[in-house]
Amino acid sequence: MYLSPEQVALVGQVFESFVLEHHQKEIAQILTEKYEDAHYSLVVNAMTLFEANMEIGEYFNAFPNEVLPIFDNALRRAAMSFLQSCSEKQTLVMKQNFHARITGLPVCPELTREHIPRTRDVGHFLSVTGTVIRTSLVKVLEYEQDFMCNKCKHVVTVKADFEQYYTFKPPITCSNEEGCNSSKFTCLSDSSTPASCRDYQEIKIQEQVQRLSVGSIPRSMIVVLEDDLVDSCKSGDDVTVYGVVMQRWKPLYIDTRCDLEIVLKANYIAVNNEQPCGVVINEEVRKEYEGFWEKYRNSPLEGRNEILASLCPQVFGMFVVKLAVAMVLAGGVQRIDSAGTRVRGESHLLLVGDPGTGKSQFLKYAVKITPRSVLTAGIGSTSAGLTVTAVKDSGEWNLEAGALVLADGGLCCIDEFNSIKEHDRTSIHEAMEQQTISVAKAGLVCKLNTRTTILAATNPKGQYDPEESISVNVALASPLLSRFDLVLVLLDTKNEDWDRIISSFILESKGCPRKSDKLWSMEKMKTYFCLIKNLQPKMSQDANVILVRYYQLQRQSSCRNAARTTIRLLESLIRLAEAHARLMYRDVVTTEDAITVVSIMESSMQGGALLGGVNALHTSFPENPREQYRMQCELLLERLGLQKLLDKELQRLDRQQNEDSLESDHGESASNISCNLVGHKVHSDSAMEETCSTNETFSSPDATRKTIPDILDMTKSDDTISKGTITPAEQNRAIRTQSKSSSKHNTQSLAGGHLSENHLTRCSDKSLGWFDSLQSVQMSPISKLGEGCTAEKLQPAVLPVLAEGSCHPDKEVVDLVGNKSEVLQKSGSSPVGTERHLSNRIVTEHVSKKWQNLNKNSLCGKTGSNMTSLQSENSGSHTVCSSGPLHSTPGAPWKRKKIIAQVEKETKAELLDPDTQARLVQLARFSFKQHSKLVHLPGGKTDIASIAQNHEDQPDQKLTPSDRLNKLDRILNNVDKASNSVKGLKQQDTLAQENPPKQTVLAQQSNSISNAATACVHEKKLNEGSDSRKVSSSTLAKLARFSFSPPPENKALEASKETLISSRAAAPSSKRKCFQLEPSSDKTTMSSKFLFSTDLDDDELDVDWEVEIKRNKRTAT
């Protein structure tokens, strides 16, 4: 079916009037061009045309091949009418080759396709989106030929048949009106004019991979370009082709199958590289991002971290990796030096890590948010697949683009990078540095652009060895590694906290996934990274000084990599600094950008001259970015020797912090006023002081320390603790979230069992935000003290105060289960406000009952006086400055006075007990010697001297040195009085030592027992003796078996022993590493195998002591 002449006239008239009304300026511009024979296009929007006349739309969709020539003729007539109506005819020249290019089809499945058309689409005008994978050479196409009749000399014009590959079919008979029926013609192609020829090119487009369904292989099809559409695109471009789907076949032969293929004859082609698909950047979008950075004007690092948290949110933590990926995606500024050489602005990143560390997740996310990107794996990539391939098609060689060429101007992600073969891997050296690929294949010599960012991931070769170089671990050559700006190592080392947090994060996201309001969507991230690509930041003088000094330090480092510490390192630093400035939405590279880049480079395997390599896997988001940056400034600038820049930067940080605090105070006051207007009750200043506390410590010496209202002075906090406002789980969670540095988000902490509103919200949330400060500050939570803790248990647990400089944030601070605990903080006087509360700075240590029983008298005697003196001294103090850890232990209540008096009575009665005196005598027989081979027992300091030392170290007891000596003399007098009651026991010991049984002699010959073993046995004897006054025969026999044959008694030796005991009792500050029972001889023998024999059993030691005495007497006689 064809259009009738009336329909053809209607279509021509309507289109001519439409063009004169809507595209008059474009026609005037075309007429001003100089070349008359060139081809000119006029782009017409189909939606606007169809709205003007729907009948034309129906004709166009039904007969596109017939309507398009009508549009061209109507456009030529419109240009002629415009030229005639124009007053300035001198500057306008009429053109013969006008083409109407239709674009902007309605978005519907009938007209818009993302997949390759099929047979049913033949003859329809469609728009197809794809990627150009191959372009052929531009050819000259003869589309018309003239044939002359040999009889009547009539000339017949024949057009080439598109469906038969533009072949010409000569006329069968002469079409002369005079009635010549000749069938013989002569071709006049030799005398054909250039007007009968046109440019011709074929390209191949492929379906976009991201638009395919699961398991689909991308298909491709040929697109025919003519006239001015030739060379409008290149390999790797994302294009949208508007054209007519047609079919063509080669000439038919007998007994051969027809080779039919579907092609797209293009009417218009739009390249989508300049405007990324799905991204719209307008003034409204710019204002949205400018408002975001205005919100974080005083704390821009927090705004940056919010963007980083939205980058690959399915991966927990990994702060350094996310920052590096974001900087690589932002990219640097490309520039041309004075010699005309182009210096690349794109950065390259290599992720080296164990399997399962999330490398591929970052690659997949980066491909999604980058408009022009290619994702490939090294295991199936060759040199031709990565660069360019020469393909022979239709008798000629063509170049087909590889992954790097397809990613020109975008991102190329290569997974399993070390799986690429060695000779294929060297082919990308030029693509990474010069960003071009030189090709000389099959007679084709050309150079293609590869201005792409390479993000690669690889596994180490075997197990990663930190002692070896990165080149040995990943089996990559140094020239290739030096082209990567950053090489981050992700080692999956043993870390229980990290494993627990990761498992909780994965299970939480699988069970009940929820989206956070702060996280940016993928479309917003995609738009932001497209927007910041337009920024051109300039280097500042301070940033130049820092980067140059760091480069010089890397060059001077003794362990430097000669292949890396070249001028490429300095260029990498500049590119990354510009990328961070883009990420921060700035036009100038500041000191903040330079410091961040140096810290990231130190975490990379390409750096390490200042701090050494860092495992980038176990890095979490900082709780306070400003304080972390302050620490980085102090650490890096001091080592770089830039003190002036350090002072300048610290002043800027203090100024930002002051402005931030002023704004927060203003906001809080405004909220308080609004609460008053509504009718809420506002607490008085005293109530606020009693219920809120600020417990912050800054890491830098220049930071301001804030005072802390002590909990003991808060009388109203008793009710909140007793009512159980906060559960122990919430309190432990709150303690765990506190970090060393302060910020506006955590300025209010625990106070009398209360948390601030913001802090309590974060703690009560089931998310894993409290783990963010795990890497920077590791603290063990302190268990809450029970209310039943008495004063006797709390009083001796006050530990010695260490110096302020001994506090280290990266070590475990407090351990309350069985080990000695030390509070690494410098505290002033510990104020005591009430009788029922202890300071939250006291950490208790659980000791044995024997130690408590021995000290009840001294402790209970001083409790009342000490409490009274402390109350009178510190009743007016309310604040304490602390530089230690930010966690605190809840106070425990005191026992009432009646209970204390009862304990004093029981203690006095127990001291008068002869059994207690006997134990004191046994305790006095201990002697202490240092020995390097003995193991330090954790229960040390159980002698009288250590007890006196503990009493002196307690800050709450106000004892003078004379009082301590008098107390020790009273204890020794009790020992002398009770010595008569154990005189018989000593005689038995001496008798057993002089006459050892046969089994003892055998034990001495086979394996000698150490003094430490004897000490442990004697201590066990003391513990058993606390239940009864008599010593069992089995225990005495056991002691006899482990004794040694004594030499003759020496009185001078006994005198020296007594002198040693008295001197050590008078000097409580002496330090002992181990202790043992006093041997009966001067010579001691150490065991060579075991401290304790494993062959002896308790049944063998169970011997009747009286029978042994009689047996020894018989042998002696």
Curated annotation (Swiss-Prot):
Keywords recorded for this protein, A-Z: ATP-binding, DNA damage, DNA repair, DNA replication, DNA-binding, Helicase, Hydrolase, Nucleotide-binding, Nucleus
SUPFAM superfamilies noted in UniProt: Nucleic acid-binding proteins (SSF50249), P-loop containing nucleoside triphosphate hydrolases (SSF52540)
Compositionally skewed regions (Basic and acidic residues) per UniProt: 703-721
UniProt enzyme class: hydrolase
Chain spans, region Disordered: 686-756, 868-893
Binding positions (ATP): G353, D354, P355, G356, T357, G358, K359, S360
Gene Ontology CC, one term: MCM8-MCM9 complex
Enzymatic reactions: ATP + H2O = ADP + phosphate + H(+)
GO molecular function: ATP binding; ATP hydrolysis activity; DNA binding; helicase activity
CDD domains hit by this protein: MCM9 (cd17760)
Domain MCM: 301-506
The enzyme's E.C. designation: 3.6.4.12
Superkingdom as given in the UniProt entry: Eukaryota
Disulfide bonds: none
Polar residues biased stretches: 691-702, 722-750, 868-886
InterPro entries xrefs: AAA+_ATPase, MCM, MCM_dom, MCM_lid, MCM_OB, NA-bd_OB-fold, P-loop_NTPase
GO biological process entries: DNA damage response; DNA replication; double-strand break repair via homologous recombination; regulation of DNA-templated DNA replication initiation
Protein's cellular compartments: Nucleus
Major localization listed first in the record, in broad terms: nucleus
Similarity field: Belongs to the MCM family.
Main function: Component of the MCM8-MCM9 complex, a complex involved in homologous recombination repair following DNA interstrand cross-links and plays a key role during gametogenesis. The MCM8-MCM9 complex probably acts as a hexameric helicase required to process aberrant forks into homologous recombination substrates and to orchestrate homologous recombination with resection, fork stabilization and fork restart. In eggs, required for MCM2-7 loading onto chromatin during DNA replication. Probably not required for DNA replication in other cells.
Quaternary context: Component of the MCM8-MCM9 complex, which forms a hexamer composed of mcm8 and mcm9. Interacts with cdt1.
Name of the protein described by the UniProt record: DNA helicase MCM9
Organism annotation: Xenopus tropicalis
Encoding gene per record: mcm9
